[in-house]
């Protein structure tokens, strides 16, 4: 076995008909976790339906259909491997909750593959003001996906004919846009591919001798392995708190950043309760330390179940402990709201595991969704489709962190049984409260 392979999560973005499914399907098909039997079954079904040539996208469509019907789908189907890395495709747009998923941290991507339709008319539609190419790229950058690969697809199309001039034209225009968003185009590989025929996907294409760069798989293998946030201070949002006979109080949650070890002194926010951790368990086994991504239960001393609850955040008392937020500034996109939203609007905010009403205290500026430029200072109202910077005030004590410090914590606002807005927290004003320190914690000081 030797060294373990690096795990990288990818999101595949791009305009509706850019060929994301075919391209993704092709990678999974060629390097992936789908067994031959499943592929043969899909191929047979595809040819029976007269979709023989559509087999790569068909693979993905089958997976999506199973996912939509909530059949818990074997996640191996969304994986593919190279010599160096294991890639998991965590979401592909077209899935209706894509934007929401990207934001609320159900999917923290390490890198994005932006698929572009290079055909005449197709490219222009995707990059136009209403196209999704720009929006997806901006969203990826805003949400902290700092590595990008651009796959200029459909180079086999009769309007493109593997043309170097078309490649240069697209590269120039998309680079300009990515630069505006915040990416450094020098570091973004542009790869002319055919997701359908496989040109430059895994092997260099014989149809494009003029292109001397990496194949798509080569570029994926060149991605920087993600730094897992175990070196950041501990943040562990609580999902539940149990009282277990003979053991005591056991909060449960997923470590988002940092590490948790038995013997640590933790502070819970927003109530500032400080105590010692007796033991940490995952799947009924004791751990010497829990790292980001681990779902753990931990036993705390001298704390009653009434003292802490879901939505609280555990942190290390000696290393930038979490605090209650007095208010915070968020950049939000209004997704669906029937009317106008003004100052004073108070939807329920979901961030990590907490679920608390937050007031739009001041809508500070309305911004352009695609460029991030200010359009209007202190607008009276914002409506569906608008992006804005808003000062928000929690209506009950809550703990949130800025997105740059603790990326897994994006926010979504709900009202009328739907997601009204999604966004990221830019900065937080924290309250300096004093809270109860248990005897166990005092002894450890």
From Swiss-Prot:
Residues 70-74 are annotated as: G2. It is found in: Cytoplasm. GO terms for cellular component: cytoplasm. It comes from the Eukaryota. Keywords: Cytoplasm, Elongation factor, GTP-binding, Methylation, Nucleotide-binding, Protein biosynthesis. The modification N6,N6-dimethyllysine is found at residue 55. Signal peptide: none annotated. This is Elongation factor 1-alpha. It comes from Euglena gracilis.
